[in-house]
Amino acid sequence: MSEFTVYPAIDIRNGKCVRLIQGDYEKETIYGHSPLEMASRFAEEGASWIHLVDLDGAREGKKVNGGHVISIADKLDVKVQVGGGIRTEKDVYDYLSQGVERVILGSSAVSNTEFVKKMLKAYGGHIAIGLDARDGFVSTEGWLETSSVRAEELGRELANEGAEVFIFTDIATDGMLSGPNINSTVELARATGKQVIASGGVSSLADLEALASRASEGVSGAIVGKALYTNQFTVAEALERVAAK
């Protein structure tokens, strides 16, 4: 059986855990725990990875909440992947040299493809490519801009440059608890021949099970956010369900 990983998500804005709906900064819910407390809770429930997003960084195009990210990577026995505002080689190096396992390059994949190719060459599997799509086209700058580049085309190009892991978000489903876009996730995995982590829309254990059932086709994991925060299920329940696949 192909391995399938559950990635509990923590979105950080102004140093707090928040959730946005469809990436809209006006539609924000703040949760009471600090990012470290929330990550600790997820780790205690059995998470092996934590997915972190520096929302301020994504919007401003530079690292803003890096201290919180490093703290989680340093203090907890989990692997951390982080995205948001990572635009320079120093940003990448700083995270990877301080315990972060994987850095996600998103907007740069469109706006500065040469930089991404250089990072793939230097850091290989420690780089994940974040492809966030609206109607099949890659969206950038914290989802504020939509490009004319198709997700599958960019994915194929970067896979040829050494990308091993992609994170695919269908913006229409993000934070909506409406179910993930499984078909588009599988299509990206087929187009690239690489691992694709699904993000956005997971609302139930059944959604996770449906994604995990496609692991042999390249769907290697799912990022879960709002469903955990609204108590649809726990990390422990999620891990139990996908382990049964």
Swiss-Prot record:
Gene3D superfamilies, alphabetized: Aldolase class I
Which reaction is this enzyme known to catalyze? 1-(5-phospho-beta-D-ribosyl)-5-[(5-phospho-beta-D-ribosylamino)methylideneamino]imidazole-4-carboxamide = 5-[(5-phospho-1-deoxy-D-ribulos-1-ylimino)methylamino]-1-(5-phospho-beta-D-ribosyl)imidazole-4-carboxamide
According to its UniProt record, in which pathway does this protein act?
Amino-acid biosynthesis; L-histidine biosynthesis; L-histidine from 5-phospho-alpha-D-ribose 1-diphosphate: step 4/9
Give the main localization category.
cytoplasm
- SUPFAM superfamilies associated with the record: Ribulose-phoshate binding barrel
Name a single GO cellular component: cytoplasm
A single Gene Ontology MF term assigned here is: 1-(5-phosphoribosyl)-5-[(5-phosphoribosylamino)methylideneamino]imidazole-4-carboxamide isomerase activity
What name does UniProt use for this protein? Answer: 1-(5-phosphoribosyl)-5-[(5-phosphoribosylamino)methylideneamino] imidazole-4-carboxamide isomerase
State the encoding gene: hisA
